[in-house]
From Swiss-Prot:
GO cellular component: plasma membrane
Species the sequence originates in: Oryza sativa subsp. japonica (Rice)
InterPro entries xref list: CASP/CASPL (IPR006459), CASP_dom (IPR006702), CASPL (IPR044173)
Official protein name in the record: CASP-like protein 1U1
Superkingdom of source: Eukaryota
Transmembrane stretches, start-end: 7-27, 50-70, 81-101, 139-159
Keywords: Cell membrane, Membrane, Transmembrane, Transmembrane helix
Pfam family, one: CASP_dom
Extracellular face residues: 28-49, 102-138
NCBIfam families hit by this protein: A_tha_TIGR01569 (TIGR01569)
Subunit note: Homodimer and heterodimers.
């Protein structure tokens, strides 16, 4: 089981790096000409939560790559460093995905869409996606990718723990 658990952990660590970079790229390229006169276009840079998302995804990719390196090259000597990097990566990814999902849900209120302050208004207006569909699609896609990255780092940590369980 030790070799299989190590392989699974390494697979998911590699997946975290790729998914974090993909989430950051999808969000960083999200922009659309806005159909109403709210400044001409909407971009991720107009929302502090989306900027946080991009920064958090990039930092989590770096942390995950460092944890991957330490897991492969210096496995025995860097156990505490890998654990710290894993915690930072999980915290950044879960908080970034949560922030994007929250902003996506509350965007009609922020933009002053008519009727958005009522439950019926939010349903009829289709949240933010009603006004800027392509932008919303990219934002939602990047948040989903980020959530998968957070789940992948969780699996990597759990399989690493399963690998060390029998050694004590």
């Amino acid at each position: 089981m030790d070799g299989a658990a190590r392989a699974v952990s390494l697979f998911f660590r590699i997946a975290v790096v790729g998914l974090s970079v993909a989430a950051a790229v999808v969000m960083a390229t999200a922009s659309q000409a806005f159909p109403f006169n709210y400044g001409g276009a909407v971009s991720y840079t107009k929302y502090p939560a989306f900027v946080y998302f991009v920064v958090a995804a990039v930092v989590s990719a770096v942390c995950s790559a460092a944890a991957l390196y330490l897991s492969v090259v210096r496995e025995a000597a860097a156990g505490w460093a890998v654990a710290l990097l894993d915690v930072v990566t999980m915290g950044l990814l879960f908080s970034a995905a949560g922030a994007v999902f929250a902003v996506r849900r509350m965007a009609p209120l922020y933009l002053g869409v008519a009727g958005a302050d009522t439950v019926a208004g939010r349903w009829v207006n289709g949240e933010f996606c009603h006004a800027a569909g392509a932008f919303c699609w990219r934002v939602t896609t990047s948040a989903i990718i980020c959530a998968f990255a957070a789940a992948a780092v969780s699996v990597a940590v759990l399989t690493k723990g399963a690998r060390h369980r029998g050694k004590h």
